[in-house]
């Protein structure tokens, strides 16, 4: 402790501990950064609960920081907490870590607010190291001809991660060179080379969302540095560009609006999410229930699009996601917690910001704008970065005069807080252990050297120990079916259906297949009926409904089922001769346009459908 006097006194353990835990989101990243397997261990909710436990252990600091907040901030935090916790207690299917996923939106910013000095020192340096790591991984992937996923696992997410981390890498590299007294003529090209190479990789990611975020953030920074007259001219110029752009889009013969409507999947998500919000306007459906509830609102035309997917866990817009998850009341609280600090910064002007603080603002704005077009606030590590940055901005916006010195904390309060922290820490550790075990099992059973009996035993143990780990359990369900164990596949499917994401991707279809193999045809019929309802243009479940009806002696069902099958085939341009091919290769059920030409298909997505 003498070697690191600030580690406990200044709270450096908080950002250091949370960052260390976050690195184990996918332990494979630490072993095989370029081509990691998916192995979820520490989720954002677990990091949030770890932050809460550590804050409860330091109850004096937590109570003092919360007491020094403005009343409006306390009300917003309390309101959001009550809505998120209310969903947890009212929904009997939510496991403990689901509560962490719902509360992480306020727990991580609160940690950065309470331990402001530690995060203010730690976060810029961590972003610089993260940028160096991601740049190295992205560079290897780029030069090897692979997709530039970086450490984020997606080209769009990787683009914005590079965008927010490269400035910190350049900033601290420049400071490091100055500290070692490198001449400016030598340090400037070195920093420029790193920054230029990073921008080259950023451009190679070809992320439209990141480019839009960069452009909008650049306009805001330009406006902050202009005089009042310059800002007025900038507003006029932007209005002129907006007007001319609108005239171009709606002008005769341009076809721009039509192309956007045909090609932009986000518009389908937005429209469907508005329907979900309209059904649950006040409190939403719950912080982790969006994917399960959104299935009912997916329109048919979505499944005719090239990028249609069996799962949708986010509408690619943070505003709509928060409204759907926590209702309009929850979103109003969240919007105030996000926008009020930014309003204070913009009102103060750029002159009050240091260079490093401008970089922090730049990073947060890029993430905020990109979050309106993608899953930035729920994807690792951008979600953690954005929430910690938000907590730093809370400090200036919400903190009033320090009142903690006059507060008295009875021993019983500190004892209760410590006990709650221990309980939260225990359940968080158990959640992490379950997640890591289920993920490692899902990866291990693909080892060809492992015996089938051993694979089945591991699947069975994992389902018993981690029944709520839906992503690994989905892989285990498919593996059990391929290994000829329908009982185990059915157990995995039932575990998925019993979780808080009942309508997980095609789970009812896999359940129906397992039930057919077990001879339980009536239950299989019900499963395929639910599958056909969840996927309104899928042909396999409807075909299986007809087959079961013939097998069980219910000919009265067949005409209506076949009518529905032919309707779906007509919309998807599928012929009866192609049905056996689709049954053999279910990928063609999702994307029938990929059926090869030699089988009568189009061999690719048509430009005009």
PLM feature segments, named:
Residues 4, 8-24, 42-55, 77-89, ...:
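Alpha-helical transmembrane segments of multi-pass inner-membrane proteins
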Residues 234-251, 408-434:
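Internal/C-terminal transmembrane anchor helices
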């Amino acid at each position: 402790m003498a070697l690191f006097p600030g580690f406990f006194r200044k709270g450096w353990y908080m950002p250091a501990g949370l960052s260390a835990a976050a690195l184990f989101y996918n332990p494979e990243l630490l072993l095989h950064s370029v081509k990691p397997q998916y192995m979820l261990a520490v989720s954002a909710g677990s990091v949030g609960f770890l932050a809460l436990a550590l804050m409860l252990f330091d109850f004096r600091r937590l109570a003092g920081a919360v007491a020094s907040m403005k009343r409006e901030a306390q009300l917003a935090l309390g309101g959001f907490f009550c809505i998120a916790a209310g969903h947890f207690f009212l929904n009997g299917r939510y496991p403990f870590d689901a509560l962490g996923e719902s509360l992480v939106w306020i727990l991580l910013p609160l940690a950065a607010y309470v331990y402001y000095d530690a995060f203010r020192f730690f976060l810029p340096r961590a972003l610089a190291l993260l940028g160096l790591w991601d740049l190295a991984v992205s560079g290897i992937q780029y030069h090897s001809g692979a997709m530039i996923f970086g450490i984020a696992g997606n080209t769009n997410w990787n683009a914005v991660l590079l965008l927010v981390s490269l400035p910190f890498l350049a900033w601290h590299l420049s400071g490091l060179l100055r500290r070692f007294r490198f001449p400016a003529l030598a340090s400037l090209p070195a920093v420029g080379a790193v920054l230029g190479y990073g921008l080259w990789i950023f451009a190679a990611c070809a992320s439209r969302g990141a480019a839009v975020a960069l452009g909008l953030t650049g306009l805001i920074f330009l406006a902050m540095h202009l005089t009042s007259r310059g800002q007025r001219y900038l507003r006029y110029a932007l209005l002129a560009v907006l007007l001319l752009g609108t005239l171009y889009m709606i002008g005769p013969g341009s076809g721009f609006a039509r192309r956007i409507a045909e090609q932009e999947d986000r518009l389908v998500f937005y429209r469907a999410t508005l329907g979900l919000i309209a059904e649950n306007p006040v409190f939403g459906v719950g912080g982790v229930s969006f994917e399960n509830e959104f299935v009912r609102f997916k329109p048919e035309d979505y499944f005719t699009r090239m990028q249609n997917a069996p799962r949708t866990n986010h509408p690619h817009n943070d505003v709509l996601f928060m409204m759907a998850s926590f209702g309009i009341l929850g979103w109003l609280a969240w919007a105030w917690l996000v926008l009020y600090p930014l309003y204070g910064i913009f009102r103060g002007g750029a002159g009050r910001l240091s260079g490093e603080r401008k970089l922090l603002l730049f990073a947060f704005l890029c993430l905020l704008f990109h979050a309106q077009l993608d899953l930035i606030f729920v994807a690792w590590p951008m979600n953690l970065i954005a929430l910690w940055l938000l907590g730093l901005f809370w400090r200036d916006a919400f903190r009033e005069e320090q009142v903690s010195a006059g507060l008295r904390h009875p021993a019983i309060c500190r004892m209760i807080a410590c006990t709650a922290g221990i309980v939260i820490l225990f359940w968080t550790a158990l959640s992490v252990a379950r997640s890591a075990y289920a993920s490692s099992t899902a990866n291990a059973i693909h080892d060809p050297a492992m015996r089938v009996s051993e694979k089945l035993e591991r699947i069975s143990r994992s389902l018993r120990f981690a029944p709520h780990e839906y992503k690994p359990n989905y892989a285990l369900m498919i593996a059990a079916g391929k290994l000829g164990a329908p009982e185990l596949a059915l157990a995995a499917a039932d575990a998925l259906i019993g979780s808080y994401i009942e309508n997980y991707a095609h789970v009812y279809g896999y359940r129906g297949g397992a039930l057919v193999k077990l001879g339980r045809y009536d239950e299989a019929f019900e499963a395929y009926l639910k599958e056909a309802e969840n996927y309104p243009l899928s042909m396999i479940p409807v075909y299986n409904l007809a087959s079961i009806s013939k097998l069980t002696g219910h000919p009265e069902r067949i005409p209506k089922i076949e009518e529905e099958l032919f309707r779906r085939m007509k919309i998807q341009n599928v012929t009866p001769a192609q049905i056996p091919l689709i049954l053999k290769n279910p990928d063609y059920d999702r994307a029938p346009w990929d059926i090869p030409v030699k089988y009568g298909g189009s061999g690719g997505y048509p430009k005009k459908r």
